[in-house]
């Protein structure tokens, strides 16, 4: 009789088995791991790399007005050694310096050369204006075998002033130049340090020599230092070059009595440009905005791990080789085919599984990683995407990479390590500063990506919850949540009914009466099953108590009649 009642109860339950609709999002078999603020290695459906590692081993110059200086050093364009004759005036927005390039012909150096190099790299080229200096009582044609053209010569933009005769008196002279242009003028002059005192006397006469230069913002005096030095290019003497930027309407004055290398023309900067030191080959078939010694970085990513000294419109250099930016939700991978998966879910988790990851394949027109529905009813099973919530998430996530780029990209300039002995401390400070900036930006990059990843995962979870709440508010008492992202519907819900739930047009009043009746039947079955469990447990407990009571009574009777004895030993 009891068996018959149980069978009838189960049959009643099966007869009123509810249709079902589930919510979830697409999952992939192999997701991508990202880091967030709170957790490392979270697997997401979609992610994109933010660190560029691909280098183009060429200087991409398409669309650029490029000048390749070859054997000419950039500073040489201002003073004019023979190797720079074709670059005394030029216009460019990309200036290429080569390792073989040399700034000078007669041995010497530039004062504060790296600052001047930075100015010229950004100059956009240079144009010249004659300073109008004339000289009497001295020779202006000094030349040297170190600066050969067809024969001995000198710097094209400089005048080597000598006494009229060997050992002759060099007169005290003063020359001035006023900048009448609207832009600053670059003025360069030199001081000659003879290889010996005798050579200095032969070239400039006897006595101490002094050169004084001044303007409204500049004042400095120079005394030559004759003496033997190692020969370079056959010369034991040296010429040191000095420079200043002369403001518009300002005047520079030179006062000297020998050992003076006089400027012939002033230089003016043409505009803006990038300058790069590289031996990479020029390529007019590719475009670039970011350059380094090894070539070109072409990337829309916010970070790069190629060269810390890249210049131009470049991604920020970071130490990390990879920083993945999440562009999809957390992934719940599935390890079986559709048929196996469906069977597994029916057996282990119900038909559709939990909220996350129940859909094993994408739908046409749907971007992987977003939201959708799956239902079961008398007409079978079906799957559909929810484009509104999908688009809402996409709209908020789209542009994450661009926002990172806006936060990180800027124009970079190259500061080299070619410092002279006096500038070593400055060079050390620059190197330390560069290393510190790399450390800071490497940390910042990791932090920025982690923040965006946290936001993406929270956002996609939020959209999933919104969709779930939308369905729950529609169904109300007509359905029951099963805790796995699904709703058991207490009335017959055909495909049109399921579509109305998805479209947010479901009318719960229309199905309320049927749903209440079916809910009562299901609840009754559950209630009967609950009472049966209570009775079974009560019966088991009572049986155990009765057995123990009988055993105790029998033991008491046996002990009383002497048929049983209990001995306690100590």
Swiss-Prot record:
Key words of the record: Clathrin- and caveolin-independent endocytosis of virus by host, Clathrin-mediated endocytosis of virus by host, Disulfide bond, Fusion of virus membrane with host endosomal membrane, Fusion of virus membrane with host membrane, Glycoprotein, Hemagglutinin, Host cell membrane, Host membrane, Host-virus interaction, Lipoprotein, Membrane, Palmitate, Signal, Transmembrane, Transmembrane helix, Viral attachment to host cell, Viral envelope protein, Viral penetration into host cytoplasm, Virion, Virus endocytosis by host, Virus entry into host cell
Residues carrying the site annotation Cleavage: 349-350
Glycosylation sites: 30, 46, 249, 335, 431, 503
Pfam families: Hemagglutinin (PF00509)
Disulfide bond positions: 22-486, 60-286, 72-84, 105-147, 290-314, 493-497
Other comments on record: Major glycoprotein, comprises over 80% of the envelope proteins present in virus particle.
Name of the molecule in the record: Hemagglutinin
Gene of this entry: HA
């Amino acid at each position: 009789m009891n068996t018959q009642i149980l069978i009838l109860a189960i049959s009643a339950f099966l007869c009123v088995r509810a249709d079902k609709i589930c919510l979830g999002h697409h999952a992939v078999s192999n997701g991508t791991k990202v880091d967030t603020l709170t957790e490392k290695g979270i697997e997401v459906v979609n992610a994109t790399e933010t660190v560029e590692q691909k280098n183009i081993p060429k200087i991409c110059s398409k669309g650029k007005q490029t000048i390749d200086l070859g054997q000419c050093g950039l500073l040489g364009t201002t003073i004019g050694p023979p190797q720079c004759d074709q670059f005394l005036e030029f216009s460019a927005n990309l200036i290429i310096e080569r390792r073989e390039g040399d700034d000078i012909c007669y041995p010497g150096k530039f004062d504060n050369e790296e600052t001047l190099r930075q100015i010229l790299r950004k100059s956009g080229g240079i144009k010249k204006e004659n300073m109008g200096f004339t000289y009497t009582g001295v020779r202006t044609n000094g030349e040297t075998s170190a600066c050969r053209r067809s024969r001995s010569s000198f710097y094209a933009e400089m005048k080597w002033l000598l006494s009229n005769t060997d050992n002759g008196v060099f007169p005290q002279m003063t020359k001035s130049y006023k900048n009448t242009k609207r832009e600053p003028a670059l003025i360069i002059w030199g001081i000659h340090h003879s290889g010996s005192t005798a050579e200095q006397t032969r070239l400039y006469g006897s006595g101490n020599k002094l050169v004084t230069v001044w303007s409204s913002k500049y004042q400095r005096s120079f005394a030559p230092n004759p003496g033997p030095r190692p020969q370079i290019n056959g010369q034991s003497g040296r010429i040191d070059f000095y420079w200043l930027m002369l403001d518009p309407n300002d005047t520079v004055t030179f006062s000297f009595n020998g050992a003076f290398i006089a400027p012939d023309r002033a230089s003016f900067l043409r505009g803006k440009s990038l300058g790069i030191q590289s031996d990479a080959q020029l390529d007019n078939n590719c475009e670039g905005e970011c350059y380094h010694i090894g070539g070109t970085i072409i990337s829309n990513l916010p970070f790069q791990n190629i060269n810390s000294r890249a210049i131009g419109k470049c991604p920020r250099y970071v130490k990390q080789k990879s920083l993945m930016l999440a562009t999809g939700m957390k992934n719940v991978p599935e390890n079986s085919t559709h048929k196996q998966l469906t069977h597994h879910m029916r057996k282990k988790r119900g038909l559709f599984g939990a909220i996350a990851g129940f859909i094993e394949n994408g739908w046409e027109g749907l971007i992987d990683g977003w939201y959708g529905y799956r239902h079961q009813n008398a007409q079978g099973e079906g799957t559909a995407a929810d484009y509104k919530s999908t688009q809402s998430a996409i709209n908020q996530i789209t542009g994450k990479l661009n926002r990172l780029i806006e936060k990180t990209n800027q124009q970079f300039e190259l500061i080299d390590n070619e410092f002279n002995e006096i500038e070593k401390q400055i060079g050390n400070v620059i190197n330390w500063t560069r290393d510190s900036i790399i450390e800071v930006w490497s940390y910042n990059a990791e932090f920025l990506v982690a923040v965006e990843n946290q936001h993406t995962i929270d956002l996609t979870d939020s959209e999933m919850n919104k969709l779930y709440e939308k369905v729950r508010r529609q169904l109300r008492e007509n359905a029951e949540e099963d805790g796995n992202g699904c709703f058991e519907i207490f009335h017959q819900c055909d495909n049109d009914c399921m579509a109305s739930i998805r479209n947010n047009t479901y009318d719960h009043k229309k199905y309320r009466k049927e749903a209440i009746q079916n809910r009562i039947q299901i609840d009754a079955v559950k209630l009967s099953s609950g009472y049966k469990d209570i009775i079974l447990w009560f019966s088991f407990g009572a049986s155990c108590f009765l057995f123990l009571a009988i055993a105790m009574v029998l033991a008491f009777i046996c002990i009383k009649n002497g048929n049983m004895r209990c001995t306690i030993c100590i």
